[in-house]
């Protein structure tokens, strides 16, 4: 029986992983470079999952991006023919795009200022609901997930992708110091740079595990697939190994299909 990840698995090569890893170095210094690469990869991910699930292209489908920031993904999804709706609670983030980036100004897209934990959309109103690297920044990540499921129509897809706390990128700009504890890492960062990290432990960065994500997703009865987002296909088995997955999975993708 075909798996919903079959198409994307063909794209999940070591070359892709290396390209994304290279881009990560520019998240803070050149965000347009990092997020541009990530946007294209995300469109490929969603397109492949949708094509495998529905047998049709993404064109004409409504995609809700929860925590869309300044709209780094907006134009990429619009270029793919999707009806893009972005949701972002922080007005500073909405306008944080570098000069020359259309983001929320792209006339083909719609943007809403709202919290992902209280989405201002009706039940069953979108085909695809995506949240990329947001769950670790909210104090109630599974409430965010429940809201995503609520607004996704039966048969649609909700894709929740988040950075794993004990993975190599869990500390974000604090680097690997998060392995000494989040609060301590934040203090060290502040001492070194003269200001707190943007992703500050306990206020804008929270520890989210693979175990808790899988447990929540299974309890919803809608889990269709779970895999490490940036790993090549031959390394996806890591997700099945407790403890090891918490350290080696940098980002977990949960694919949910409401019924």
From Swiss-Prot:
Keywords: Methyltransferase, Transferase. Its EC number is 2.1.1.-. Gene3D superfamilies: Vaccinia Virus protein VP39 (3.40.50.150). It is an enzyme of class 2 (transferase). InterPro entries: Methyltransf_11 (IPR013216), SAM-dependent_MTases_sf (IPR029063). It comes from the Bacteria. The keyword Methyltransferase applies. One of its GO terms (molecular function) is S-adenosylmethionine-dependent methyltransferase activity. Belongs to the methyltransferase superfamily. This is Uncharacterized methyltransferase MAB_4481. It comes from Mycobacteroides abscessus (strain ATCC 19977 / DSM 44196 / CCUG 20993 / CIP 104536 / JCM 13569 / NCTC 13031 / TMC 1543 / L948).
């Amino acid at each position: 029986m075909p798996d919903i990840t079959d198409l994307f698995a063909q794209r999940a090569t070591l070359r892709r992983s290396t390209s994304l890893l290279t881009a990560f170095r520019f998240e803070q210094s050149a965000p347009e470079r990092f997020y541009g690469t990530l946007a294209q990869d995300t469109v490929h991910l969603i397109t492949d999952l949708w094509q495998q699930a529905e047998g049709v292209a993404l064109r004409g489908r409504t995609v809700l991006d929860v925590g869309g920031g300044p709209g780094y993904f907006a134009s990429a999804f619009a270029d793919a023919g999707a009806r893009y709706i972005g949701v972002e609670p922080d007005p500073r983030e909405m306008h944080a795009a570098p000069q020359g980036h259309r983001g929320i100004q792209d006339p083909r897209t719609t943007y809403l200022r709202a919290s992902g934990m209280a989405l201002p959309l009706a039940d069953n109103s979108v085909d695809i609901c995506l949240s990329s690297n947001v769950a670790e920044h909210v104090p109630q990540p599974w409430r965010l997930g429940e809201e995503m499921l609520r607004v996704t129509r039966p048969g649609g897809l909700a894709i929740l992708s988040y950075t794993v706390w004990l993975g190599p990128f869990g500390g974000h700009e604090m680097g690997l110091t998060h392995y000494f504890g989040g609060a301590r890492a934040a203090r060290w960062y502040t001492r070194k740079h003269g200001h707190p990290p943007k992703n500050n432990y306990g206020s804008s960065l929270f520890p989210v595990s693979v175990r808790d994500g899988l447990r929540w997703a299974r309890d919803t009865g809608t889990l269709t697939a779970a895999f490490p987002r940036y790993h090549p296909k031959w390394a996806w088995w890591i997700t099945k190994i407790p403890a090891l997955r918490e350290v080696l999975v940098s980002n977990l993708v949960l694919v949910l299909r409401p019924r």
